[in-house]
Swiss-Prot record:
The lineage of its organism: Eukaryota, Metazoa, Ecdysozoa, Arthropoda, Hexapoda. PANTHER family: MITOCHONDRIAL TRNA-SPECIFIC 2-THIOURIDYLASE 1, TRNA 5-METHYLAMINOMETHYL-2-THIOURIDYLATE -METHYLTRANSFERASE. HAMAP family: tRNA_thiouridyl_MnmA (MF_00144). ATP binds at G8, V9, S10, G11, G12, V13, D14, S15, M34, G124. This is Mitochondrial tRNA-specific 2-thiouridylase 1.
Amino acid sequence: MIRNVVVGVSGGVDSAVSAHLLAEQGFKVLGVFMRNWDEADEVGRCSGEADLKDAEWACRQLGVELRQVNYVREYWTAVFSQFLDDYQMGLTPNPDILCNRHIKFDLFHKHALENLGYDAVATGHYARNSLGNYLEGIASNNDARLLIPADTFKDQTFFLAGISRKALQRTMFPLGDFQKSQVKDLAKKIGFQRLAKKKESTGICFVGKRNFKDFIQEYITSKRGPFLDIDSGAVVGHHEGIHQWTVGQRCRLSSFLQPYFVARKEAASNTIYVASGHNHPALLSTHIAVDPPNWLCSKSQQILSDTGSLRCRFRFQHTKPLVDCQLSISPSNTFLVELDAPLRAITPGQYAVFYDDTACLGSARILSANPLKKKNAQTQQAQAANLVS
């Protein structure tokens, strides 16, 4: 039976309201604030100290003890170093997925259950657990599934798709049935107006409000290279480092009638291939190679293992619509995704996240995306128009 719950308290309204809801349900609640980035670093501009003060204030109002854990070294090793390595290799990483996998739902989760001896962990994520918002169904011995929340606009299952099934089995999402507006209304009702009015954090914490190109140049040395037209092979401009660009990004090259967009990056030669036009075939893909998936749904994993293929739904950006797809295993044991409709700017290093109608099934890092062949492009460009605008 679940009695004692550790809540990851960030200083924001969502985690504070989650702690309130847990206390109202009668759980013994312990708040823990995670410090993952060292603000002494001259580049990082996270609002860590202000967030800590807000977390302390919220816990005082709730009568909940607050402790701190420091994962700065572990975050640097497991998340930030990987982030830099990927950019130097021409990839575009997702540090939020890595942070959830390695820090919040691994180190922190284990600390809460094994070191502190608590029964479960709760977070302020907008997601649902099939065992219940408060793990009411944990005694059933059923596997937990990561379900889409009531507030589909705030859905954060995309960023949780890399966590382990073991961690999910002992994780509560008290906000799973709430709309964001309801959370803010409740916060005001219980005296948390200052948190309800607080601006939501967006983007990458360690970048803060800085321009990304300015930030990344502090860690990766610029290296001048060519922009090559992917059709003609002609040099149409120069860049100052492949780490400053991502697939689909507009290059803003002068002296050309049509705008150019990044189609592909080649780290070995420090070359960026660019395509003329927003929906150039080189920017559209239906076939994707991915790493072996991290499965949150054992049934889907078993279907793929038994039959060699799985019908599901796909996205690689959390704000984009889901697209039907088929995930398969090739004879060479490669995992392949075939989309029913082409998508624009599918980016190596990002994550393919798989869904059914109600749940997030798992995720896999994208290795490559094959561009549309020109002879098929005209009809498929029209098919893609509604998805890539």
